[in-house]
């Protein structure tokens, strides 16, 4: 499935719009605790472990969004937007959301 942040796909005609699709994932507080405990792997101001968890959360949200689009019969998602937001009473969890428009493009 083609996934893009742009509202069109150059050289392709959109033949059907299905509407908004989304995928979400939440990283719990225990993950943050584990990450901060391993803060020793920071190199140049970056934490490789933290970045890997964020990358996995993003990938999960995108996969859920694509699965929802596939169920509708779409073969692409356009206008994709990723959002990161803290949730929970003390902001102890991070939610990653992927949103876009499910479409069918010509082959």
Curated annotation (Swiss-Prot):
A Pfam match: YbjQ_1
Query: Do you know which PANTHER family this protein is assigned to?
Result: UPF0145 PROTEIN YBJQ
Annotated family:
Belongs to the UPF0145 family.
Annotated protein name in UniProt: UPF0145 protein BT_3410
Query: What species does this protein belong to?
Result: Bacteroides thetaiotaomicron (strain ATCC 29148 / DSM 2079 / JCM 5827 / CCUG 10774 / NCTC 10582 / VPI-5482 / E50)
Highest lineage ranks of the organism? Bacteria, Pseudomonadati, Bacteroidota, Bacteroidia, Bacteroidales
